[in-house]
């Protein structure tokens, strides 16, 4: 993948995008030089799928934006090859291919909202029944489509990037093939698959936040997640608290200096060995809270707890641990 980025002279600079083993991006110029952030000099970046931007992991500066490739992924050198390789009508995502088409509404009303007469109601009921039969043939398909619809609902409610949802759908498919879904609710299994997918793609969401948007309980989702880990033999990277910082800062509209300070606090905490076994979202919220205080932004712990999807108690406890262990002199409000 390649794109262009403005330079100090105003001319576009062609960059090649590479990804390392940890999932971070590095940018290389057409001359083979490593591109560095013009603000802080860092050479590692992350991709924001929601905005189509490449962002510096240290200062939060956007170094590239509007990365949207509308061309085909294949190359053709003759008109015959182009005709053979061109295709139309293929699904854009797994969600669309899994029968997420329009359905006849369960409300017996017309387009203007008026109740249908009895004759039309009976006709709609009959059509609805035939549509269900035509779309779904087996219990496997019914279960899978129900999960796809639940994942699409979670994506819309939580603002989860679509690639995470597609990965979650693939995880659910594997669970369904191994009959892990039997005896468990579709909502809990779909939520667990989405939680796993977000972590796999280094865009983690707190479990407590996810549970708020599903009918399943936290205990049920956590149990299904452990089952998926054990039975599918999936390697899920340990959540880095740093990955939560940009989302918290974006919700609270914090400055790049606050983000940079929060990352430095977490890096020191890792070296001190106080991050192991702690909720990464809570650690990130506490680090951003401390960084905000150091930069004169006196918001409440509740603001940071809500943005991170954790409780105030968690933020307070992690804040005390970080400040005490790292000997940070936090200004009193």
From Swiss-Prot:
Cited CDD domains: CYCLIN_TFIIB_archaea_like_rpt1 (cd20549), CYCLIN_TFIIB_archaea_like_rpt2 (cd20550)
TFIIB-type zinc finger span: 33-64
Its job: Stabilizes TBP binding to an archaeal box-A promoter. Also responsible for recruiting RNA polymerase II to the pre-initiation complex (DNA-TBP-TFIIB).
PANTHER family in UniProt: TRANSCRIPTION INITIATION FACTOR IIB (PTHR11618:SF13), TRANSCRIPTION INITIATION FACTOR IIB-RELATED (PTHR11618)
Protein name, as recorded: Transcription initiation factor IIB
Native source species: Pyrobaculum islandicum (strain DSM 4184 / JCM 9189 / GEO3)
Gene this protein is translated from: tfb
Listed SMART domains: CYCLIN
Keywords of the record: Metal-binding, Repeat, Transcription, Transcription regulation, Zinc, Zinc-finger
GO cellular component: transcription preinitiation complex
GO biological process: transcription preinitiation complex assembly
Residues the record lists as binding Zn(2+): 37, 40, 56, 59
GO molecular function: DNA-binding transcription factor activity; TBP-class protein binding; zinc ion binding
